[in-house]
Amino acid sequence: MYLKHIHLYGFRNYHEQTLDLQSQKTILLGNNAQGKSNLLEAVELLATLKSHRTNRDRDLILEGKKTGQILAMVERTYGESELGITFRSPGRRSLMLNHENLRRHLDFLGHINAVEFSCLDLDLVRGSPETRRSWLDTLLIQLEPVYASIIHQYYKILRQRNALLKVIRKTVEEQENSSNLSAELSQLKVWDQQLAEAGTRVTRRRYRVIERITPLAQKWHQEISSGTEILAINYLPNIKIENEDPQQVQQAFLDKIEQRRMAEQQLATTVVGPHRDDVEFNINHTPAKSYGSQGQQRTLVLAIKLAELQLIEEVIGEPPLLLLDDVLAELDPNRQNQLLEVIQGRFQTLITTTYLHSFDAQWLNSSQIMKVEGGKIAQL
């Protein structure tokens, strides 16, 4: 997999910029707030249709513009593909593949794969459960593009069920006609079933991906820590499951919904389902979030990112792109060397940095070095 070029128009702080990628390794050099991370964000959007920095398309469009666009050419073993995303404010984004407009996200996803590693990824360990759920979902979308539709459908059902729970609470509080309440409770049973079915599809996939990535991350973690630390990754689903059998998982959903029915009606929100899942990271049997040093947390995240690269390559049959956003400065020399040694010429890599002294001469000589300043990119 090779990203040959990328063109940005009205995206973030770029008026119009084309970058031809002529090396397996591209170093983007520049001060902060010049546009280095914006370029990596564009690649992330091409891979996942998501940004880890914002949920609003308006934020992706250059100030004063009504549209922004990312165009790219990617080369795979089966041939070349031209990808395009157009953002509108107001309006919905549109997707393009080989000059044809696409109606479904599913048809766009999977043409380019990327793993991003930035200093923000420490939030994976010390941040909220929402951060860890988002990490799982982003990984799953790249491994199985149909997952984007599965998770979208789940949250759509969740919103509709929550709306009905609010109506039910209002009916109870205002002591309205009991026949209205009876009809609403019957309707809730229908949403219970839909939530359990959609939630089962999400839970089973999250369960499986944790099972697959854990041994890979443990292997990398052993290597980076020189065998002094033991990593454990535990999926903490909101419902108790023994295995990923779909019937058992779905029944566990329905049982817990029944147990929490009164609480949900009082709170007027759904408290059962994968939107309440979490992932736990332990180092030497101790929660990394609470007790891990910053060095241990960085080692953990680096191991996970290397495991992501390995897992995606195993599943899709080609190495994904690696996006390193000002991360070398956050790593000590040992971890820097581990990371750079793994990359070598195996993964096409885009690296942002404010200085070059983290790289040895051999790395610099084999890299394309670009200067980024004020939304403009030029060969150094």
From Swiss-Prot:
One of its GO terms (cellular component) is cytoplasm. Coiled coil: none annotated. PROSITE patterns: RECF_1, RECF_2. The keyword Zinc-finger does not apply. The keyword Nucleotide-binding applies. One of its GO terms (molecular function) is ATP binding. Keywords: ATP-binding, Cytoplasm, DNA damage, DNA repair, DNA replication, DNA-binding, Nucleotide-binding, SOS response. ATP binds at G30, N31, N32, A33, Q34, G35, K36, S37. One of its GO terms (biological process) is DNA replication. It is found in: Cytoplasm. PANTHER family: DNA REPLICATION AND REPAIR PROTEIN RECF. The RecF protein is involved in DNA metabolism; it is required for DNA replication and normal SOS inducibility. RecF binds preferentially to single-stranded, linear DNA. It also seems to bind ATP. Belongs to the RecF family. This is DNA replication and repair protein RecF. The gene is recF.
